[in-house]
């Protein structure tokens, strides 16, 4: 189980003699990813590490879309949405051959440690690389809040506030016409976003996948 392995991992840069780290964003983008990238790059550089940006997630890793990052690369990015490293989904990382190739490319480019910003699928890929000897750290970045071992994820707060703005407008119209509105929010198989928005807006009922079997 990747979640227990990630939660129990303890990466010490000095002990592992890490000199170069890579950072990538994978899967769906989430608000705040650029701020996380900026923090990784700036902290890495200030710690005397080489930092390599991996573009387009695991797909970019397999295609060796990798370049050195400087402080200038992350300037004026903290307030921007999306991800400056771009993102993509990568079916090849689900295969043993793809995982082996990704690990070999990390070693080829001298990447001693990899920072993966993404959701559960991204973490699954990171765990596969860890099993192949690549030091990995996962930063939970998903609006769904469906990552084990954490109570908060990058992007969740913005998702709640964005949904709240839309729900407030719908509620005004519903009240004016004496109607009942059913509002669906994102979250896939996790009901956290629905619960937070429902409580904040005083919903009469909140239907979540953890409570109901929709099949």
Question: PLM features: residue spans?
Answer:
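Short, small-residue-biased leader/transition segments that mark boundaries at the very start
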Residues: 1-8
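Glycine-rich oxoanion-binding loops at beta->alpha junctions
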Residues: 4, 14-15, 61-116, 153-166
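N-terminal phosphate-binding or glycine-rich loops at protein starts, especially the Walker A/P-loop
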Residues: 14-62
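Short glycine-rich or small-residue beta-strand-to-loop segments that form or flank ligand, phosphate
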Residues: 20-28, 84-88, 112-116, 181-184
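Short, ordered loop/turn segments at secondary-structure junctions
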Residues: 26-29, 54-60, 89-90, 119-121, ...
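Short Gly/Thr/Asp-enriched flexible loops that form oxyanion-binding sites at enzyme active sites
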Residues: 35-40, 121-134, 194
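Accessory alpha-helical/coil subdomains and C-terminal extensions
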Residues: 116-118, 128, 135, 156-177, ...
């Amino acid at each position: 189980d990747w979640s227990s392995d990630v939660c129990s991992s303890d990466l010490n840069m000095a002990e592992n003699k890490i000199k170069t780290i890579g950072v990538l964003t994978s899967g769906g983008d989430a608000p705040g990813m650029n701020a996380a990238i900026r923090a990784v790059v700036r902290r890495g550089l200030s710690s005397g590490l080489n930092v390599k940006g991996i573009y387009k997630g695991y797909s970019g890793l397999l295609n060796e879309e990798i370049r050195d990052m400087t402080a200038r690369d992350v300037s004026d990015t903290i307030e921007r949405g999306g991800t400056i490293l771009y993102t993509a989904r990568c079916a090849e990382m689900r295969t043993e051959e793809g995982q082996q190739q990704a690990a070999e490319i990390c070693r080829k480019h001298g990447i001693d440690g990899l920072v993966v910003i993404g959701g559960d699928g991204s973490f699954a890929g990171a765990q596969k690389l860890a099993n192949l000897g690549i030091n990995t750290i996962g930063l939970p970045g998903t609006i769904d809040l469906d990552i084990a071992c954490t109570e908060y994820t990058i992007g969740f707060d913005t998702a709640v506030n964005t949904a709240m703005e839309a729900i407030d407008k719908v509620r005004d119209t519903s009240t004016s016409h004496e109607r009942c509105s059913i509002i669906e929010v994102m979250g896939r198989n996790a009901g956290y976003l629905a619960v937070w928005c429902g409580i904040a807006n005083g919903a009469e009922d909140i239907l979540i996948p953890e409570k109901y079997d929709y099949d």
